[in-house]
């Protein structure tokens, strides 16, 4: 249906009925509002009538109160005078006075309206029953209504004022002309309309209710209500005429310009090579619509041109196909890559252009059939004049209804990228000097290589004298030697072996399914071949040797990575035996087991330091002569496991020294020992503790400053601390150690030379070292009582030290016989199990106080 007919249907079917319906609804609404106004006035008038009645009753009650006392006390003459005055007043019209005395109701004035005797008795009974000092109520006799007010004057007497209410009196209660009639009744008048209502009044007789029945007039509102007359019809006809004129105006001003615009839009071709805008006449809205259409056409043209320029400029080849995989467009790059003109390619199948067989067409059909939203990428070989590796991407083309109408095939020449990737992969996995696998590739291939073997031998090969070549001839010559060694090793291997360069001068070799004897023979052959390699440089000849560590594994318990670690440890043992040696890893070899576990111990030591698991023990040093003024003890170190087990230093000290952890251990021992001294100041006068300093700590940078800072923090006297250094450490770190000892001596600390006699020291070194004590090595002390040579050595050391002013300490004192011999020689102090076993340092004070108490 055309838009003009739609407008006509809208006017006839919607606008005209709407005009009639609105007119009718307005009339109904207005009548409803008038009715609401009438009901509101009725409620207001009822409330007003009730209020006026109460005001009238209150006024009568007030009047009764005024006259009650005089009427009950005046004599007959005075009553006559009062009666004449009352009758002459304007208030006496409908009012009558009565006195209730002895249960009888009597008129006060003779000329007042009489009340029947039965009614009088009923009024008297009601007043007597209520027994109130005053009250006001309504009373109905027949169709006549009265208002009765009573005031008690004496005991049992009441003065009553009775007013008869006529219909005129009742109508005067109303304030508007809305009330037509007011009457009194002792029943509620039933009414089925809202034109009358009833108001309850206080009744003199409780069993006889009295109501004011109010009737309302409908005349004031009848004139304002609307009804369907000729005026309403005229309004409806006028509305219809206006609607008809509006339709004519709409047809001329809107439909005709819109029809012209639609004719122009029907001729628009979005794919036209020339941009032609549409024009509009008539109104601003159609101009906006035309401008929006022109803007859309301009964007379509701009995007079409931009897409065309983009496709012609990009480096990728782009081919558009229809749903049958027939070519409908090719950009210039595709023409160059495929060596075919676009005009010749249109209509051809994609597979025939790329010379890829039906496989490519099937890929296109598969992409269309699945409705893929993501590009489908794959690599193909392009068989042109120069073969190329192409990355092709197929994407579906959708129309506005999300239907697939074709595909876009993007071809990218990745020949150079593939070559570069191959080179990078080779560099990532192979050593550039030897051409062998590097460590990363070796460790990646090792598990797979091991999974296919029944038995496995992992070998760790380390070159000897290779550093000499690098230092003497330079790294270029070293690289040449590495290449020569790699070729020599490869010449001995078959396809079932895996060889790699895993370090500077280190090689890894994996041998599968050979006996230990065959492996040993192969390795000896490799050593022989490597030994034959000679590097000529600067008129010099250089050779290298090999140290080989071997670790064996047998399926199914082959862990290649662990075997490589074991082979590395075995290689260290082979190097220790000399050049061109082979060592096979044996887990029963304690030294190899220690080498293997040393890294774990290093981690455990670092954890113990961090988590405060280092414990201090002490071993007493007893003076053997009367000159010993201070009680001495050596501070020993332990590690407490989380389970509570105590680890002796022999289990971890060697690992700490190998991984340079001793300075941190020494610092923690110093801190804990100084803390213990600071908490036990009662020991400062007569005690001295000995703390061992390792070779790594002797002369270490910052160690003197650390000791000085800890002394300052804990504020302990330096004469309570003696540092022990071993004889070998003092000689190996002679210059740095001497400087450190001098600085600490300035701070007041004393020093002891430990294990004296076990190393290479001479008395000349002893003369140079600023030590206060010499601890004689236990190897000379433990057999002192039965070995004359040991006795002579200990005696000579004691004689020299006495001359030099150095006190001596004998270690490993295990029985009383040794103590006696030491006293004979003149040794100053003794230390060993005969003196006391190591105990926790925290328990020393308690034991010391116990001994003092026992002595006392």
Curated annotation (Swiss-Prot):
Cellular localization per UniProt: Cell membrane
Gene3D superfamilies (UniProt xref): 3.30.70.270, EAL domain (3.20.20.450), PAS domain (3.30.450.20)
Enzyme's top EC category: hydrolase
UniProt cross-references to InterPro entries, sorted A to Z: Cyclic-di-GMP_PDE-like (IPR050706), EAL_dom (IPR001633), EAL_sf (IPR035919), GGDEF_dom (IPR000160), Nucleotide_cyclase (IPR029787), PAS (IPR000014), PAS-like_dom_sf (IPR035965), PAS_4 (IPR013656)
Entry's Gene Ontology cellular component terms: plasma membrane
Matches recorded under PROSITE patterns: EAL, GGDEF, PAS
Phenotype upon loss of function: Deletion mutant shows decreased swimming motility and increased biofilm formation under rich growth medium conditions.
Topology in membrane: Multi-pass membrane protein
Catalysed reactions listed for this entry: 3',3'-c-di-GMP + H2O = 5'-phosphoguanylyl(3'->5')guanosine + H(+)
UniProt domain GGDEF: residue ranges: 454-587
Alphabetized UniProt keyword annotations: c-di-GMP, Cell membrane, Hydrolase, Membrane, Transmembrane, Transmembrane helix
Annotated EAL domain residues: 598-852
Major localization class: membrane
SUPFAM superfamilies, per the entry: EAL domain-like, Nucleotide cyclase, PYP-like sensor domain (PAS domain)
Domain PAS: 303-350
TM spans (from-to): 7-27, 230-250
PANTHER family linked to this entry: CYCLIC DI-GMP PHOSPHODIESTERASE PDEB (PTHR33121:SF23), CYCLIC DI-GMP PHOSPHODIESTERASE PDEF (PTHR33121)
Functional note: Affects motility and biofilm formation, and is linked to the regulation of sulfate uptake and assimilation.
Protein name, UniProt field: Cyclic di-GMP phosphodiesterase PdeB
